[in-house]
Amino acid sequence: MAHKKAGGSTNNGRDSVSKRLGVKRFGGQVVLSGNILVRQRGTKFHPGTNVRKGKDDTLFATMDGKVIFAKKGKFMHQYVSIETA
């Protein structure tokens, strides 16, 4: 009788879908109110003037204007602001 042993199992073979995080509008770009500026987990970038933070830490513009990135404070946190025209 011909026999073939059972193939072994594996714990690999899975991968999660990418979340498309990161900066969506860069410094100097003109944006409209409501535009998403940064998608992030945690506060790598903090909201500055005319920018608010959503419940998933997404930063979005509250006014039309130009995007500005700056490092401020004792710990040099990165802030995203909107400069209105």
UniProtKB/Swiss-Prot annotation:
GO terms for cellular component: cytosolic large ribosomal subunit. InterPro entries: Ribosomal_bL27 (IPR001684), Ribosomal_bL27_CS (IPR018261). GO terms for biological process: translation. Keywords: Ribonucleoprotein, Ribosomal protein. The keyword Ribosomal protein applies. It comes from the Bacteria. It holds the Pfam family Ribosomal_L27. GO terms for molecular function: structural constituent of ribosome. PROSITE patterns: RIBOSOMAL_L27 (PS00831). HAMAP family: Ribosomal_bL27. Belongs to the bacterial ribosomal protein bL27 family. This is Large ribosomal subunit protein bL27. It comes from Ruthia magnifica subsp. Calyptogena magnifica. The gene is rpmA.
